[in-house]
């Protein structure tokens, strides 16, 4: 999965299969804002879960 651009923000997911953990790095105008962490099971995180985390973040922050 690649980056998600939404409302002027860029969300770049990355993950480790070994540790079963991931993070979504949030950027605004190229500047790092914060990191959203998550865990998952299997070989890859579910794309829908990443999109849901981004949507929840935007809603919570009023973006």
What kind of region is each of these model predictions?
Residues 1-37:
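N-terminal acidic leader/helix
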Residues 31-63:
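Mixed-charge, Lys/Arg-enriched low-complexity segments
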């Amino acid at each position: 999965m690649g980056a998600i651009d939404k409302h002027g923000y860029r969300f770049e997911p990355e993950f480790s299969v070994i540790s079963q953990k991931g993070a979504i790095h949030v950027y605004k105008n190229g500047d790092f804002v914060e990191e959203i962490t998550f865990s998952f099971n299997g070989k890859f995180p579910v794309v829908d879960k990443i999109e849901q985390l981004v949507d929840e973040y935007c809603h919570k922050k009023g973006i």
